[in-house]
Amino acid sequence: MPQKEYHNQATWESGVASMMQNSHSGVNQLGGVFVNGRPLPDSTRQKIVELAHSGARPCDISRILQVSNGCVSKILGRYYETGSIRPRAIGGSKPRVATPEVVAKIAQYKRECPSIFAWEIRDRLLSEGICTNDNIPSVSSINRVLRNLASEKQQMGADGMYDKLRMLNGQTGTWGTRPGWYPGTSVPGQPNQDGCQQQDGAGENTNSISSNGEDSEETQMRLQLKRKLQRNRTSFTQEQIEALEKEFERTHYPDVFARERLAAKIDLPEARIQVWFSNRRAKWRREEKLRNQRRQANNSSSHIPISSSFSTSVYQAIPQPTTPVSFTSGSMLGRPDSALTNTYSALPPMPSFTMANNLPMQPSQTSSYSCMLPTSPPVNGRSYETYTPPHMQAHMNSQSMTTSGTTSTGLISPGVSVPVQVPGSEPDMSQYWSRLQ
C-alpha cells in the first residue's frame, strides 16, 4: 500500500512538472494528468482494456488509473464497437466519412427499402466492403445524410410543382404575375398577352379562352393542382342537414357510435360530422346568449318600482282628509253601521322602522290608498294610528295626545309600505303592544 501511494505521488509530481513545462496541460478531478487536445497514451488505453477484461467496472478503472469516467467509457465503447483502441485523427477535425460514394449508397439503400434503419445501413456498408471500421460513418451521421436527402427531395418536388403551375399559366418569367393568374381581365392600354380575342357585349370587355381541347385540359389540370393545395369546404345537402339537426335536437354531444351511425346514414365522413356538431354547438351558444339578453330586457321593462303608487282601479281612492288621520264609519262590506270600519292613509316609505309616538302628522304626508281593518271597540287613539287597549289607558293618559279621539287602527310605523292587519281581540293586542314597546 505505501508503495502504491508513493507511485501515485510520483505520478502526480511528474504530472505537475509536465504541466509547468507545457502551459496547455492540466490535472483532472481524480489527480490524473492530461494534456489538452491530446489523447491518452496507448499504454493507458491498453490498461483500461485489460482491467475491463478482468471484470473491473468503468468507475473502478477510473479511480485506479486516475482517468475521467467519460474518457474510460468512450474508449471502452469504441473498443467494443470497432475492436480498436487507437484514437481518432489527432489534430484538427476528423476526415469526412460521408463521401459522395457513401452518400450515393445510402440513398440507394433508402430507395430500395424506405423503412430501413440507420444501423442497418451501417451494417450493409460494412458487409459489402464499401467502408471499413476506420472510415465507417456513425449512426448519427447516417441519419443526418438521410435528413438531407429528404429535404432535397421535398425541395425538388416543390420546384417541380411550381414549374408545372408556371407552364399551365403560360408564364416564362416571374411567378404569380397578373396576366397569368387572371386570364379573364386585361390591363387597359396594353395588348392582350394571352392572344385571346376581345368581344364587345353588354358594355364590358372580356377575354375569351380558346375552345380547343388543350386549353380545357390545362384548365382541368390547374383546378386539380389547386384542389391539392387547399381542401374545399364541405357542402351539405338538405337531407343531410335535416338528419344532422334532428340528431342535434336529441343530443348536443353524440358519441362515436352515434356519429358512425349518422355517417353511414347520410354518407358523410365521421370527422366532418364531428366538426359540424362542434360548429353547431357554437352557434347554439350564441343564440342562447341573445335569447337571455332579450329576456332580461323584457323583465326590466315590465318591472314596477316599489315607490310608485297603486292603481286606483284596484284600490278605491278616498277624499283627502283635513286631519292627519281620516276616520269614516259605514258599511263598506255590508256590515251594519254599528260595525266600525277604519280607513287610514299610510305615510311614504322612510329609511328607518321606528315608532314615532308624539310627532304630529302633516296632511301633505298622506298617500292615496286605504285599507279596511277588523272592527274594534271605540277607544282613544294616538298619533300615527297606534292602537290602545282599555287596560292600557292609565299608561296612555300620561303622554300627550296630538289628535282628538275616535278609533285608530293598529299600524306599524311609516317605514312599511304594505298595510299590516292587527288582530282585534284585546288579549292579542296587549301582547302586540308589549312587543312594540
From Swiss-Prot:
List the SMART domains. Answer: HOX, PAX
**Presence of keyword Cytoplasm:** no
Q: Which Gene3D superfamilies match?
A: Homeodomain-like, Winged helix-like DNA-binding domain superfamily/Winged helix DNA-binding domain
GO biological process terms held by the UniProt record: brain development; forebrain development; regulation of transcription by RNA polymerase II; retina development in camera-type eye; sensory organ development; type B pancreatic cell differentiation
Residues covered by region (Disordered): 183-220, 396-437
Function per UniProt? May be a transcription factor with important functions in eye and nasal development.
A GO MF annotation of the entry reads: DNA-binding transcription factor activity, RNA polymerase II-specific
Low complexity bias spans:
402-427
Ranges of compositional bias, category Polar residues: 187-213
Q: What ranges are recorded for DNA binding?
A: 23-149, 229-288
Query: Which residue stretches belong to region PAI subdomain?
Result: 26-82
Q: Where in the cell is it found?
A: Nucleus
Entry keyword set: Developmental protein, DNA-binding, Homeobox, Nucleus, Paired box, Transcription, Transcription regulation
What PROSITE patterns does its record include?
A: HOMEOBOX_1, HOMEOBOX_2, PAIRED_1, PAIRED_2
**Chain segments carrying region RED subdomain:** 101-149
Which SUPFAM superfamilies does the UniProt record give?
Homeodomain-like
- Naturally occurring in which organism (per UniProt): Oryzias latipes
Q: Would you tell me the protein name for this molecule?
A: Paired box protein Pax-6
Major subcellular site: nucleus
Gene Ontology annotations for the cellular component aspect, listed alphabetically: nucleus
Q: Which gene encodes it?
A: pax6
